[in-house]
UniProtKB/Swiss-Prot annotation:
Biological process according to GO: methylation; protein modification process; protein repair
Gene coding for it: pcm
Record protein name field: Protein-L-isoaspartate O-methyltransferase
Organism for this UniProt entry: Synechococcus sp. (strain JA-2-3B'a(2-13))
Location(s) in or outside the cell: Cytoplasm
Gene Ontology CC terms: cytoplasm
InterPro entries registered for this protein in UniProt: PCMT, SAM-dependent_MTases_sf
Amino acid sequence: MINPFSSFRWRHSSRSPAGIPEVEPQPPDASDPFASQREQMVKKQLIKRGIRDPRVLEAMGKVPRHLFVPSDLRDRAYRDCPLPIGYGQTISQPYIVAFMTEAARLTPESVVLEIGTGSGYQAAVLAELARQVYSLERLSPLAAQAQQTLAALGYRNVEVRQGDGYQGWPEHAPYDAILVTAAPPTVPMVLLDQLAVGGTLVVPVGESPSDSGAQGSQSLLILCKTAQGWVQKGAFPVQFVPMV
């Protein structure tokens, strides 16, 4: 089993034929004041709550979550809670990011579609595990900021585009996995159509909280596509911003 707390420096090389991040063992980076917080996040929020995939744990322990949140919230970046990122949107709590990523069952050759780029954090985690990530964001300012952050961190296997998540990204379909980070009222069949047979769709579905204070009701669905249709593998109560 990979030790998720080993010190590595990730190098994203455009010369790698598969676009897979290369790992170089390095001494602990004393210049990173958040390294110990990431380690504690993985130990206390993820492993203790059942996240087991060593590749997911390693990715969560490497991606600098504090660089995907507003600067005045960086001291809260590794807490077990969502945080606002502007425009009425949030970055999901670390456990939800890890849970959805693990549910997607990614391999180093996977091609992934993300609906709802937001800050770009989920896309970065996916990029550590997959060959290529395509991410759609409805809000142009968030799409631009996420692309800038991802590029600055060296991610060459992520492409971000402003667009309507309900339409997906048919040019690159079929996808091995599709993750949706906002809640539609029902499962978008267009996204299932863009999923490869054997692929997984992870999507929160249901009503979002209303301005009047009603809580709403949502479930995180894990749907696996088969040659005959699709099979639901799980449903868990969650609370996401609405998909619009």
